[in-house]
């Protein structure tokens, strides 16, 4: 799966969408944090060991020759609650025959994201074009096949119907790779966006897409579908790409996809993600970030890779929260509009959606003001 959403157990997708207004119970301090942009603390919820224990952790963080696997450090241990909305959301998905990357990628955050809570609305990242991928990335737990079942023509309508029932205002649509389909499924992807916008015009839609085999017409089809954020993940650094991703997923090809989106729709907010802990060096991470900036990428997320099953790539290193904070600062210095970097950060992470939602609303307001001034 080329989009892969920083897949594997790495797809700890944190997709809860928080809504506030005049009647919100959110404290003012938390509202300000979200408006200004998140820090590591904003990305971690549930019961996590005290940060005092992080710096004192004496366990091994790097895999050495002969080691079977690394022990999970304290900063990656948290409670996984299941809220009252969990079963309702799951029932909607089953009724409409839809798949989510939350389930297919065995995301351990599924209970929290789907469950919601007093201050947040449950949501999920919808995975369209089926639950079977034509590619086999070595970090991803989504099932694969050369010839998956045909695309469901009713899926765009069903997707819009499901989302309308959830009452959210920001949704992420991703997909498996469909190399068996002529256009890679770009027209189908586009129809999903159009149906959502037709049913809920105010909905902010982020699409996390495949590379469409480098077919730039297919990329443009999705970019011009009416979405608000175009996301495509490079997943890892250039040197590790042939080892980590499917051979058909090329590092430079992914950069070209992101660049072409900006050429097609210059004002489009673009986004990408990098997994850490696969054996990359600091210089390689920095170079990948620089490559993304040159491609015009606005938003970047970095998070810890975790091995989904014994058949997948082993974790080579558990990156510390301090190091993730360093990369967040580097991202800001490089000029990314938004950099989310932390052990539990995932490419569709909740706090990122807050920030991007504010960015998009600001753009809408500016566009309205420009139109008004021109008319006057």
Swiss-Prot record:
Top-rank taxon, per record: Eukaryota
Name of a matching Pfam family: LIAS_N
Binding annotation for [4Fe-4S] cluster 2: 133, 137, 140
An example Gene Ontology molecular-function term: lipoate synthase activity
Cofactor(s) the protein needs: [4Fe-4S] cluster
Classification via PROSITE patterns: RADICAL_SAM
Segments traversing the membrane: none
Pathway: Protein modification; protein lipoylation via endogenous pathway; protein N(6)-(lipoyl)lysine from octanoyl-[acyl-carrier-protein]: step 2/2
Domain Radical SAM core: 116-337
Subcellular location: Mitochondrion
Keyword Acetylation part of the UniProt annotation: no
Gene Ontology annotations for the cellular component aspect, listed alphabetically: mitochondrion
Major location category of this protein: mitochondrion
Cofactor note: Binds 2 [4Fe-4S] clusters per subunit. One cluster is coordinated with 3 cysteines and an exchangeable S-adenosyl-L-methionine.
Keywords: 4Fe-4S, Iron, Iron-sulfur, Metal-binding, Mitochondrion, S-adenosyl-L-methionine, Transferase
EC numbers for this chain: 2.8.1.8
Ligand binding ([4Fe-4S] cluster 1): 102, 107, 113, 348
Swiss-Prot/TrEMBL GO biological process terms: lipoate biosynthetic process
Catalytic reaction annotation: [[Fe-S] cluster scaffold protein carrying a second [4Fe-4S](2+) cluster] + N(6)-octanoyl-L-lysyl-[protein] + 2 oxidized [2Fe-2S]-[ferredoxin] + 2 S-adenosyl-L-methionine + 4 H(+) = [[Fe-S] cluster scaffold protein] + N(6)-[(R)-dihydrolipoyl]-L-lysyl-[protein] + 4 Fe(3+) + 2 hydrogen sulfide + 2 5'-deoxyadenosine + 2 L-methionine + 2 reduced [2Fe-2S]-[ferredoxin]
Note: This protein may be expected to contain an N-terminal transit peptide but none has been predicted.
NCBIfam families according to UniProt: lipA, PRK05481.1, PRK12928.1
Family: Belongs to the radical SAM superfamily. Lipoyl synthase family.
Descriptive protein name: Lipoyl synthase, mitochondrial
Species annotation: Branchiostoma floridae (Florida lancelet)
Classification of source organism: Eukaryota, Metazoa, Chordata, Cephalochordata, Leptocardii
């Amino acid at each position: 799966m080329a989009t892969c959403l920083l897949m594997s157990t790495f797809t700890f997708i944190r997709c809860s969408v928080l809504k506030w207004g005049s009647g919100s119970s959110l404290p003012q301090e938390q509202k300000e944090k979200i408006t200004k942009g998140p820090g590591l603390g904003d990305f971690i919820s549930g019961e996590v060991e005290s940060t005092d224990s992080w710096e004192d952790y004496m366990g091994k963080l790097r895999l050495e020759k002969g080691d079977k696997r690394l022990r999970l450090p304290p900063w990656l241990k948290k409670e996984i609650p299941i809220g009252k909305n969990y079963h309702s959301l799951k029932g909607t998905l089953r009724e409409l025959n839809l798949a989510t990357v939350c389930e297919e990628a065995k995301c351990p955050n599924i209970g929290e994201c789907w469950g919601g809570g007093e201050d947040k609305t449950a949501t999920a990242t919808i995975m369209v074009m089926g639950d079977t991928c034509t590619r086999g990335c070595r970090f991803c737990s989504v099932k694969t096949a050369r010839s998956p079942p045909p695309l469901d023509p009713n899926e765009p309508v069903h997707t819009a119907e499901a989302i309308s029932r959830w009452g959210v205002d920001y949704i992420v649509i991703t997909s498996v790779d469909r190399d068996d389909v002529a256009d890679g499924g770009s027209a189908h992807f586009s129809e999903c966006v159009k149906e959502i916008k037709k049913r809920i015009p105010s909905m902010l839609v982020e699409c996390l897409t495949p590379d469409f085999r480098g077919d730039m017409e297919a990329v443009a089809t999705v970019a011009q579908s009416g979405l608000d954020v175009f996301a495509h993940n490079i997943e890892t650094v250039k040197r590790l790409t042939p080892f980590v991703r499917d051979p058909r997923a090329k590092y430079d090809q992914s950069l070209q996809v992101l660049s072409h989106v900006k050429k097609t729709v210059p004002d489009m907010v673009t986004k990408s993600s990098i997994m850490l802990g696969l054996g990359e060096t600091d210089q390689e991470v920095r170079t990948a970030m620089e490559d993304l900036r040159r491609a015009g990428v606005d938003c970047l997320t970095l998070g810890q890779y975790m091995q989904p099953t014994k058949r997948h790539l082993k974790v080579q290193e558990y990156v510390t929260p301090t190091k993730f904070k360093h990369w967040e600062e580097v991202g800001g210095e490089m000029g990314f509009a938004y950099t989310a970097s932390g052990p539990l950060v995932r490419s569709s992470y909740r706090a990122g959606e807050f920030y991007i939602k504010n960015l998009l609303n600001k753009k809408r307001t500016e566009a309205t003001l420009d139109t008004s001034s021109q008319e006057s």
